[in-house]
């Protein structure tokens, strides 16, 4: 088994997968796929808890990529830095969380 105590599983999702934020987003396949990823996060967190493996879902932000476009809020580097910084101090007790790229809690 490759995942030992202290390992972290990071699922990149989207705020569109949130039941609160994504309810009015008009792209059923995309929203559904992200909602599924959020459930995968919760299920894996439950299954891996006893092994000491943390699982977290991240909304990376509106990122300047081909998909996000040039007017998006943040760069790829800012998003990645925020996620990695959050993971450095992420407590195992919070496994199963849905977070924004900056470490703040995202509503489910």
Question: Predicted segments — roles?
Answer:
Residues 2:
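Conserved helix-to-beta-strand junction in the class I
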Residues 38-45, 55-57, 80-83:
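Short amphipathic alpha-helical surface patches that serve as generic macromolecular interface elements
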Residues 5-50:
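Catalytic loop of short-chain dehydrogenase/reductase
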Residues 15-17, 63-64, 68:
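Conserved sequence/active-site signature of Rossmann-fold short-chain dehydrogenase/reductase
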Residues 50, 57-58, 65, 69-108:
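C-terminal helical subdomain
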């Amino acid at each position: 088994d490759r995942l030992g105590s202290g390992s972290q599983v990071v699922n990149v999702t989207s705020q569109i997968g949130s039941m609160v934020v994504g309810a009015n987003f008009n792209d059923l396949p995309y929203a559904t796929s992200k909602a599924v990823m959020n459930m995968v996060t919760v299920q894996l967190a439950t299954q891996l808890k006893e092994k000491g493996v943390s699982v977290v879902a991240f909304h990376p932000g509106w990122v300047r990529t081909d998909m996000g476009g040039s007017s998006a809020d943040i760069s790829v580097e800012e998003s990645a830095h925020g996620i990695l910084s959050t993971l450095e101090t992420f407590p195992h007790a919070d496994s199963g969380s849905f977070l924004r790229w900056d470490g703040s809690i995202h509503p489910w």
